[in-house]
């Protein structure tokens, strides 16, 4: 049986990755929907747009992701990241289908010295983090049949991301200062797409309540932004790109409107145990993405 999978959004890193993955499969039909048919800022139009497509599962991946801009436009970010997610949940409940929602490490303060587990207290430092947390709560209120997947440090061959920014800056510079006192788990959107589809399939196939709730899903392994950048340039140089030196700098040397968590590491043991999902090591996935970008 072909499963109809509704995806919120029609572009961006995760949607691009989902479209690529779905193109190789015959058991799913991906239904990406975005503006004007689905405008997450227009609350009253969300449910009719979703219900008209009658999906078997909903992947809620579209979001307001401009972290710094959200500091001066939290109302818009809240409408998209918070209120709209609740409306998606209500529509799913009426249809009797599960929702898999993508969230973020930004719901945490980053003060914990070890990787965060799902039950750790939240404490977002930024407007973006607050609105994403609001979306988690709104979805949980709207429907019990959901899985919230928190991820971090997303990159891919698509959209705007750290890997593409580093490669672009490296074209005209011999050295770059990159923050070294923030640590996390770089995560390829291509791997996220695999995880989303696996969890969606599990929720369709089983009504086991243990498969619902909050899960952490990131690339395996950890590094700093400076370490991530150094690996990107090492890989690029090995493929014929120019050599770029990474100079580690503190967060204080690169001020931004939104505060970032110092520790973005997420413990992914729960999703591996219950859903059988373990994303690949970040270095291997980074090599695959860099190779595509450099070759392209």
Predicted regions and their residues:
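NAD(P)-cofactor binding segment of oxidoreductase domains
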Residues: 72-100
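NAD(P)-dependent short-chain dehydrogenase/reductase
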Residues: 137-186, 190-198
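Active-site helix of classical SDR
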Residues: 131
